[in-house]
Each structure stands twice: as C-alpha cells, then as structure tokens.
Amino acid sequence: MNGALGLIETFGLISLIGAMDAMLKAANVEPAGPIVKLDGGVVSAMVRGDVSSVRAAVEAGAEAAARIGELRAAHVIPRPGAAIVRAFGADASSGGGAK
C-alpha cells in the first residue's frame, strides 16, 4: 500500500460511527475494511488514503469520538506493509481516497 492506514478504536458503536463520519468528512479518505467488534463493547475501524489526509482524518475522528463517547486509541501507519494490510482485511487497492 502506497498511502497510509488510519485506525481508530472506541468504546461503543455510536462513538465509532461519529468518528467515522468525522473522518470521512474531514479528508480525502475512504473506509478500509469492516468495523471490527471486540469484546466488552470495543469497536474499531480503518480508513485509507494518502498520509496527510489520513493524519487529518484520524485527528478529526479522535476528537469526535472523545466528544461523543470514549476514544480508546487512534493511530496512523504510513505505508503499511502488505502483511499488515492482509492480516486485518484492509482494502489496499489504492493509496488514495476516492472522494
């Protein structure tokens, strides 16, 4: 993957939906795989795009998640290795967003 992968993890689906909405509106990114449901109400999602867009999106998503509910973690991986992308089911068909 030439671009970046942005990850966000929240407690509760509503916080994650708010975070994803903010991320997709804030920058030229697109979802990269399904929402992952973990134990205890923890959920996570990924976006992909160019590095600067993913950084801006994750920052906006983290702020939204914290405002709505509980942000657990947020992280950007520039140029993730192919094994990481495959392991987590991220769609890596392009490095940029599709807006």
Report residues per predicted region:
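Long, contiguous binding/interaction regions
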Residues: M1-G41, M46-K99
